[in-house]
Amino acid sequence: MVLDSGLAVGTRPTVDAPPELAGWAGAASAVHACQQMAFPMTLRLHVAAHDVIAIDFASNAFEWSVSLDDFPQAPETVLVETRPGSLDAPAIELPGRSLDPLLWSIGLHAFGDEPAPWLVPGHRYRLRRWPSLSEVPVNLDQVRMIAMLGNAFATADELAAAAQTPPLDARRLVNALAVMGILRRSAGAPAFEAAGPHRRPTASGTTGLFNRLRERWGR
């Protein structure tokens, strides 16, 4: 059975996150909640010493005075403010900046070596669409793992084993894609199998997928 994970919660004003959801963890959880709403939502993230991020989910865009090249990996605080949005009155000046690179950056740094709290243990995940990551650096291991998730369901540990990369890196990547809201999950998909034992995927062996991804990212 294939599902899109979902959790609907109400809106809330600017608040301090509980300790377990401090920093980007609280922001990532708020992003996920907004993505599950049946009506448009906007989100404002007050990042300590780094101004305010304004996100309009209906427009799939955000505003922020900070370049993603200077993304703060561990800000002292991130205060969260959610508000109802409107399709007729965007909360930011459009076209804004593409949302995928921001959510990718938040997801990579939100939960450390733990999975995002809405990911279900034992379930496998696969891409619903390719990410759009033209504003952020993506290394070859990440490209490999994204390509794998574009073609099969896998857990983070299975992904790490197949890509021969540290499990922490695979968990962070799955978290980033989960915060972007582009994963679907399956309780019954078969275990992911690598192309061969003890073989690290090579660029030449996955050229088609890499080219498609890099073309999608504008690289």
Language-model region placement:
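Acidic, Ser/Thr/Pro-enriched low-complexity segments and adjacent helix/loop capping patches
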Residues: 1-219
